């Protein structure tokens, strides 16, 4: 976050753009790793408050209008939901065996889910199953809402790539993308930081597998192997979703855990997230 803030100042001094979008991600990591109730989060808050405060003061000295926007508030979680494993048990998921590893075959699957924290997009390739899939997901422990296309439109969520169904978890739950039943058959990328090959967001990437003895030494050995030209997998990630302590996506009951928008008006009234865009455009025009 400090490097990003310094880069933002560098760009402002050299180019003075009409619009700068600056993302300071520091809080995101430990809030998911430790959970918002962990006392260690206070130090993270102080650290990012200093970085953000210095950047805001810098822009103020240059006469730049600033808007502070948080994407989401993170809530404590204690359980995970593996939709694709349930779908597999129903016979709806197709997997390919590659050298003893299982890959999800989305095209051949009747149903599959793409996980995104506390939201899951469910794609139903067999339309005749839609009602059964919805009933199955609605009956899962930890799922609070399932929206079809019409319900998505009513809430401003319907996108051309949205799932046929969109599921929301309870505040204390989140969705994993896991689809294998045996960790020995998990794909090689499951234990790596590999966001583009996974079937959804994987917050377990924030952890090093606690079962690995001397992890720094193992990482060094892998980097040496790579430097020597050998194929190497940085497979240091655990497959234990219980490690995750914070998530987001479901609207919390406590408004203190909602995201904030500061600097676009004097009203304290909440607004739907779909209207943030026009507020930002108005701030740019004003």
Features from the language model and the residues they span:
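Short glycine/proline-rich, acidic loop/turn segments that cap or connect secondary-structure elements
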Residues: 243-261
